[in-house]
Amino acid sequence: MKIIAKKDLFINDEIRVREVRLVGLDGEQLGIKPLSEAQAIADDANVDLVIIQPQATPPVAKIMNYGKFKFEYQKKRKEQRKKQSVVTVKEVRLSPVIDKGDFETKLRNGRKFLEKGNKVKVSIRFKGRMITHKEIGAKVLAEFAEKTQDIAIIEQRAKMDGRQMFMQLAPIPDKK
């Protein structure tokens, strides 16, 4: 059964058609019935009459407990949202002439991000005449990648973009 938003569902007294194709509690077809008879059947069973396909001719109405239906639908949606994981990209900025202590600090931050399951974009910004020594920047990025290879894979290799060189690391899927 296709789940329809509340605005598309008409329940009990909101239904404004003469006859409906009726579906019972267990999903059995009860045929085309006048609206008054369908509502009487629903009232006898102490449940709701809900139009589930208003565009059909005649509209399809189902006898169901609408409160339970709504609860199950919300529960299913909540479960789907729980299964979704949002992966964010964190950035670690380095310099081509970075000191060893600073490098270790940035490396620690990058590892923390990767352990939390985030992707890490490692970037190096070249200032002034440093741009002529791209190999120094590439060496720094290679060292960063080497020191995180136990928890990350290189998703995008080192690449130049204007005055910036960057690469992207992603956590190894089974080590989140």
From Swiss-Prot:
Instruction: Name the GO cellular-component terms.
Output: cytosol; membrane
Chief subcellular location: cytoplasm
According to its UniProt entry, the function of this protein is described as: IF-3 binds to the 30S ribosomal subunit and shifts the equilibrium between 70S ribosomes and their 50S and 30S subunits in favor of the free subunits, thus enhancing the availability of 30S subunits on which protein synthesis initiation begins.
List where the protein spans the membrane: none
The similarity annotation says:
Belongs to the IF-3 family.
- Keyword Disulfide bond set for record: no
A Gene Ontology molecular-function term?
ribosome binding
Arranged from A to Z, the UniProt key words for this protein are: Cytoplasm, Initiation factor, Protein biosynthesis
**Gene Ontology biological process terms from the UniProt entry:** ribosome disassembly
Q: Which InterPro entries match?
A: T_IF-3_C_sf, T_IF-3_N_sf, Translation_initiation_fac3_CS, Translation_initiation_fac_3, Translation_initiation_fac_3_C, Translation_initiation_fac_3_N
- Which proteins does it associate with, and in what oligomeric form? Monomer.
Q: Does the keyword Isomerase apply?
A: no
Q: List the disulfide bonds.
A: none
Localization, per the record, is: Cytoplasm
Q: What is this protein called?
A: Translation initiation factor IF-3
Organism in which the protein naturally occurs: Streptococcus thermophilus (strain ATCC BAA-250 / LMG 18311)
Domain of life according to the entry? Bacteria
PROSITE patterns hit by this protein: IF3
NCBIfam families (UniProt xref):
infC
